[in-house]
Amino acid sequence: MSAPIIDGKQISQDIRASIQQEVIRLKEHSFQPGLAVVLVGEDPASQVYVKNKEKACHDLGYYSEVHRLAADTSQEALLELVDKLNHQSTIHGILVQLPLPKHIHEKAVIDAIAVEKDVDGFHPVNVGNLVIGDDSLLPCTPAGVIELIKRAGVEIAGKHAVVIGRSNIVGKPVSLLLQRENATVTMCHSRTANIADLSRQADILVVAIGKANFIDASFVKPGAVVIDVGMNRLENGKLAGDVDFESVKQVSGPITPVPGGVGPMTITMLMQNTLVAAKRSHGLA
């Protein structure tokens, strides 16, 4: 018997519909959320991501700016642009598309973004607030993971969650968010002994390691919720997650597919963060 599929596309559409209604209400206060996206260089994947963010802004009625800079743009010039956007009243969220060219220090750029406009949730102050449980703009993909679990009707509190992967972008923040929801969390990584044994103990399994089809049914406890954050391009051009979907869905509980699971949520949560930042800037949140 196959597991229920967590439809990230539909959940994302539902959230966007709510955002759209709120934007309409905000326009009654004579302002609209504004997002600035900065792209340095011509990385093909980054160009696609930026276009998708631009489209989301248009669809939801946001004000948006896209700043496309040459690959040889200096760090100083990029920081000057960030500072300008920090002081621009029509912009409530700033996103600098990663990765940056090697001559630019990513941390210096992230640190330069105003905390209240850091809609990626990467600024050290927002990361610190995440750790101690204070209100902050949350990293988009981890926030999307939590939203998917909740909207699948899963009670997180009291569950044993296993997170495979410890990246600063997904693994670490998603483990903190799961703890905030009162799960007991085990984090696994490349140096973890007996990953399969630990994985089989999970009521909720989140996988973000960047290895196509790494997790098969032998890693999964029957009925466990499985969230696949992986996005890997196979030699045949198809996308695959970190989870062997066809194998795992035979034993798991609710499971996210790739594509169509976590992916659609990332930009939606970025739009949500921008909305929150806009409301806060006007004393409405």
What are these regions (language model features)?
Residues 1-31:
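Positively charged, low-complexity intrinsically disordered leader regions
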Residues 40-54, 136-225, 238-246:
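Glycine-rich phosphate/diphosphate-binding loop of Rossmann-like nucleotide-binding domains
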Residues 57-72, 185-187:
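Short beta-strand elements in bilobed, periplasmic/extracellular small-molecule ligand-binding domains
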Residues 77-89:
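Short, well-structured alpha-helical segments in soluble
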Residues 96-156:
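Anion-binding alpha/beta catalytic cores of soluble intermediary-metabolism enzymes, centered on
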Residues 99, 208-211, 230-231:
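Short glycine-/small-residue-rich Rossmann-like dinucleotide-binding loops
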Residues 102-103, 213-215, 234-235:
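Short glycine-rich, flexible loops that bind phosphorylated cofactors or substrates
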Residues 107-123, 127, 230-282:
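Rossmann-fold NAD(P)-binding glycine/threonine-rich loop
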